[in-house]
Amino acid sequence: DYDVQFELIDCTTGLPLEDHIAPNTSCYLRVTNRTPELLYMNLLDIDSKGNKYLVLPMDAAATCAHLLVPAMSTWSFKAEPFIFGDEPSDETLLLMAVREPVDFSIVMDTIKTGGQGTMRVGLNRRFYQVK
């Protein structure tokens, strides 16, 4: 529903990572919001065993303000770096974007908005191999 994209940026080089990533690579998320709306974003990592991880943590107050990406802009989450594991793995990364603050840990269920039905969600998926 929303025109959003992401790439992973190598913390050491500052360059986008390719589809094949070396083990223990440290990186951060850079997202592009091509909509006229302010959007909350998070990244879900699904490994080859089906384990799921949210890349960006919730803030203590659960306001999600740190997950906001301005309209028509590119934003780097440099303050939230993460490291791929040391074992070979296939990783599917799914960017989620919504207009209202959401506890993204609920992504295993249908996302609802205040009991008023489903909400529009922007998704962008990329596949990486750690080897």
Residue ranges and their predicted role:
Residues 1-131:
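Secretory-pathway glycoprotein ectodomains that are cysteine- and/or Ser/Thr/Pro-rich
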